[in-house]
C-alpha cells in the first residue's frame, strides 16, 4: 500500500466518519428530542421529517447537476460541511424559538437546513468520495465502512450525552462538522486528475437532465426507492419513541436503544467489508431486491411482535 493510498484512504474515510457521526447522533435521538424537549406531538414530528424529505427532493436535482459540473472540485461539499458546524447553534438557540413563534416557519427553516446538511447533502458527499476513490484506486465500499463505525460510535456516545444533557448531542455534531471541514481542506485533489476530468467528461446540458425524466427505467427505480428507502426512513423516525415505551423508565429505554443502535451499526460495519464483493457477485438489481425484502421483514416483524427482545432483533435487520 503506497503512502499516497494510505493518506487518501484514511483522509476520505475520516470524512465519512465525521459526516455519518453527525447523521447518526442526530437522527437516532431527534425523534425523542422533538417530543420531550421541543414538545411536539407525533403528527408534528412526522411533519418535520416529511418536510426534510420534501426539501431533499428540491435539492437533489440541482445538487446532482452542480456536482457533475464541478467534478472533483470541493465547493458544494464545503458548503454542506460548513453548514454542519451550526447544528448546536440552530437546535439550541434558533429552532425552538421559531417553533414557539410559528410552527410552520420552524418547520420550513428546519426542513431546508437539515436537508442541506443531511438528506439532500448526503448524495453530494457519497458521490464525491466515490468518484475520488475510483480515481485513487481504493474500494469505495471499504471507505464507506468508516460511516458504519461512526454510526456505532455516535449511537453509544450519543446515548450517554443525551441522558446527561439532550442538547449536547447537537454540540457534538457541531464539533464533528468542524473536524469534517478540516479534513476536507486537507484532502487536495491532484491538478492532473482535475484536468483529466475536464478533458474526458462530456458536457452535461439541461436537456440531458430533462431526458432522464422521460426514461421509464428511471421512474421504476424511483418507485423502488420510495417503496423501500423512504419507508425505511419513516420507520426509523418513529421507532425510538415506540421502543422506549416498553421500558419501566424512559431513561432505561434510551440507554438500551443507544446500545442497540451501536450494536446494529457495528454489525453493519463488519458486513460492509464483504458488501462490495456480494454486490459485485449478485448485481445491483438483486442487491436492491434483497434490501427491499429485508426492509419488509424488519418493519412487519416490529409491527407483529411486542416484546423488547423481538423488537431488538428486528431492529438489527437491514
Annotate each predicted stretch with a short phrase:
Residues 1-6, 187-222, 248-249:
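Juxtamembrane intracellular "pre-TM" segments in multi-pass secondary transporters
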Residues 2-57, 217-225, 229-248, 256-257:
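Helix-loop boundary and gating motifs at the non-cytosolic
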Residues 112-147:
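Cytoplasmic helix-loop-helix junction between adjacent transmembrane helices
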